[in-house]
Amino acid sequence: MRVLGLETSCDETGVALYDSERGLLADALFSQIDLHRVYGGVVPELASRDHVKRMLPLIRQVLDESGCKPADIDAIAYTAGPGLVGALLVGASCAQAMAFAWGVPAVGVHHMEGHLLAPMLEEQPPRFPFVALLVSGGHTQLVRVDGIGRYQLLGESVDDAAGEAFDKTAKLIGLGYPGGPEIARLAERGTPGRFVFPRPMTDRPGLDFSFSGLKTFSLNTWQRCVEAGDDSEQTRCDIALAFQTAVVETLVIKCRRALKQTGLKNLVIAGGVSANQALRGGLEKMLGEMKGQVFYARPRFCTDNGAMIAYAGCQRLLAGQHDGPAIAVQPRWPMESLPAV
């Protein structure tokens, strides 16, 4: 089965073609970072308009690179949620229109299920069951995964997601957008131990997260330095390192707890923040101590992309699942409500 995947949940337009026997045939992506940078964050209306502009050229690019024609497509998968409603509707409308024109089924894919399954595109994919850490700009969740659609939520952020905290903290200390990569870049030049930030909610039982306090702690630390006459680049680097270390160690502690609680040895880390090298290093060290293994997608499939949507959609289509002709999206959509495959 050949599935065309469309991703338009936020500020990346992604298109990919996946073959159930041959694997990924082609993928293309356009990032809107430069469009939104001047505003310091994603502007939903601009995101939707740019998806309209980019979608068809990217589809043509993927078909050309794969050597396929519309007649070779067996089905279409698209991100149906969660995400920005206008952006989601662009992808859903395009998918349903092509499905109608080409006489093929379409299936809406949960954006975070796409992220969760992205490591399945690698040469050594994880095997069920495993614990997944979904960590992105909109989500921070620990999930027990026993199969596709068989998800048990173990813990989640009660306020800001980790990626959101990265972006907001970067803005508070005068860094550019997107903040996550900027924090990571400056942290490489930070002085270890100059600032020590708290590890929120690690002093109590449970697997939930809270990162809004770290954002405030970072701002207060920066303001104290500025008031003392120190607004240097090195101080920004030191705060970035302290913030990143606190987030990474908090995530590592909670992942260790989740693995011990479930008795599982394999951990999947997915979502945009999974590209952070400090986080990968911390989790690899922890899994090494536990005699377990950590899995993640290659860096370009950590952020939003069409390949993960094509793969996830293919699995559900092979199980006989597909949508009706109505154009419908779900900006809020709990992943544990998905049917099993």
From Swiss-Prot:
**CDD domains in the record, alphabetically?**
ASKHA_NBD_TsaD_bac
Enzyme Commission code: 2.3.1.234
Top-level taxon of the source organism: Bacteria
Q: Which GO terms describe its cellular component?
A: cytoplasm
The record's listing under InterPro entries reads:
ATPase_NBD, Gcp-like_dom, KAE1/TsaD, TsaD
A GO term, aspect molecular function: iron ion binding
- What binding details are noted for the cofactor? Binds 1 Fe(2+) ion per subunit.
Q: Tell me which SUPFAM superfamilies the record gives.
A: Actin-like ATPase domain (SSF53067)
Cofactor(s) in the UniProt record: Fe(2+)
GO biological process terms held by the UniProt record: tRNA threonylcarbamoyladenosine modification
Listed binding positions for Fe cation are H111, H115, D304
Question: Where, subcellularly, is it found?
Answer: Cytoplasm
Which keywords appear in this protein's UniProt record, sorted alphabetically? Acyltransferase, Cytoplasm, Iron, Metal-binding, Transferase, tRNA processing
Name the chemical reaction catalysed here: L-threonylcarbamoyladenylate + adenosine(37) in tRNA = N(6)-L-threonylcarbamoyladenosine(37) in tRNA + AMP + H(+)
Q: Where does substrate bind?
A: L134, V135, S136, G137, G138, D167, G180, N276
Return the Pfam families for the record: TsaD
What is the protein's known function? Required for the formation of a threonylcarbamoyl group on adenosine at position 37 (t(6)A37) in tRNAs that read codons beginning with adenine. Is involved in the transfer of the threonylcarbamoyl moiety of threonylcarbamoyl-AMP (TC-AMP) to the N6 group of A37, together with TsaE and TsaB. TsaD likely plays a direct catalytic role in this reaction.
* Homology family: Belongs to the KAE1 / TsaD family.
Protein name per UniProt: tRNA N6-adenosine threonylcarbamoyltransferase
Q: Which organism is it from?
A: Pseudomonas paraeruginosa (strain DSM 24068 / PA7) (Pseudomonas aeruginosa (strain PA7))
Q: Source gene?
A: tsaD
